[in-house]
UniProtKB/Swiss-Prot annotation:
Pfam families assigned to the protein according to its UniProt record, in alphabetical order: Glycos_transf_4 (PF00953), MraY_sig1 (PF10555)
Biological source species: Caldicellulosiruptor saccharolyticus (strain ATCC 43494 / DSM 8903 / Tp8T 6331)
Compartments where found: Cell membrane
Keywords, in A-Z order: Cell cycle, Cell division, Cell membrane, Cell shape, Cell wall biogenesis/degradation, Magnesium, Membrane, Metal-binding, Peptidoglycan synthesis, Transferase, Transmembrane, Transmembrane helix
Protein name (Swiss-Prot/TrEMBL): Phospho-N-acetylmuramoyl-pentapeptide-transferase
Lineage: Bacteria, Bacillati, Bacillota, Bacillota incertae sedis, Caldicellulosiruptorales
Cofactor: Mg(2+)
Transmembrane segment boundaries: 7-27, 50-70, 77-97, 113-133, 148-168, 173-193, 198-218, 221-241, 247-267, 298-318
Length: 318
């Protein structure tokens, strides 16, 4: 199902992370880039304080090198690469503010949203000149032209997805594992859509996340930080844009969406009633506080991601 170049992209990106991470972890520890754990988080997370973060830099390096190796043959890889790089830069600045400047919450929410919308609108404005404004709706089995609404709708979906991936990065191996599965499905869809460039970029995501899991699975030796989660979120949705498949990505990334919605519901319900729907949001923390082991929550969420991908596959076949 995967072509030779995509398999090579997976292997190359995987090996880069495996080779670089053993050097990066002690270097991040030397720079005192330790994770700051919030006091209101689950008690079991307090022991994670000081674990090196910003490991997403290695994920990004892996994707960057792999993409550049294939760029001459597949120049359209440059579009999602630049978009992912821009979102990764926001994440890096956010991590820098939290870890180095010791401001625990990082950039202000308003600052991040403005920057994210600026990147999204710029990216969409450029690519729509080449791709047009039509997107594929799987359930309808046809393309729909969004016309003037293309940039407003797609930019909101992009920013929402990027932040949803960021919110999912709260347990050891959760975001990296879910993104590995999503990336693999996107690679397969890209091949069937005859988009080898997007298959290779998706493969780079798969390989880098696979390599990162070696060090991020419970108990994690390193976290990706916002550097990694925002970059991966931007990468995933930019592939969706290039494939004209934003709806499909919202389905296969259903776990991201559920995590984000759990936070939105928690905040809105608390403001209205001063009560909470969940013990804690995002949703993965709710299950932790119900007594589930962290590793169990992660594996169950991986399984649900696979189910979402199978649902998407069934919809495509209808």
């Amino acid at each position: 199902m995967l072509d030779v170049d995509t398999i090579l992209a997976i292997i190359i990106s995987f090996l880069i992370v495996l080779i670089v991470m053993p050097v990066a972890i002690p270097f991040l520890r030397y720079l005192k880039c330790g994770q700051v754990v919030r006091d209101d988080g689950p008690q079991t997370h307090h022991k994670k304080s000081g674990t090196p973060t910003m490991g997403g830099l290695v994920i990004y390096l892996s994707i960057l090198i792999t993409s550049l190796l294939f760029y001459k043959k597949y120049p359209q890889i440059g579009a999602p690469l630049v978009c992912a790089s821009a979102f990764g830069l926001i994440g890096f600045i956010d991590d820098f503010v939290k870890v180095v400047l010791k401001r625990s919450l990082g950039l202000r929410a308003r600052e991040k949203l403005v920057l994210q919308f600026l990147i999204s609108i710029t990216f969409l404005y450029i690519v729509k000149k080449y791709l047009g404004t039509d997107v594929y709706i799987p359930i309808l089995n046809r393309y729909v032209d969004l016309s003037w609404a293309y940039i407003p709708i797609m930019s909101v979906l992009m920013v929402f997805t990027v932040n949803a991936v960021n919110l999912t990065d709260g347990l050891d191996g959760l975001a990296s594992g879910v993104t590995l599965i999503v990336g693999l499905f996107l690679a397969i869809v890209s091949i069937f859509s005859k988009k080898s460039d997007m298959a290779i970029f998706s493969g780079a995501i798969v390989g880098s996340c696979m390599g990162f899991l070696r060090y991020n699975a419970y108990p994690a030796m390193v976290f990706m930080g916002d550097t990694g989660s925002l970059m991966l979120g931007g990468a995933i949705f930019s592939i969706a844009v290039m494939l004209k498949q934003p709806v499909l990505v919202m389905i296969i990334g259903g776990l991201y969406i559920i995590e984000a919605i759990s936070v939105m519901l928690q905040v809105m319900y608390y403001k209205l009633t001063k009560k909470r729907i969940f013990k804690m949001a995002p949703l993965h923390h709710h299950f932790e506080l119900l007594g589930w082991d962290e590793a169990k929550v992660v594996v169950v969420f991986w399984i649900f991601t696979i189910i979402f991908c199978l649902v998407a596959l069934a919809i495509i076949q209808i």
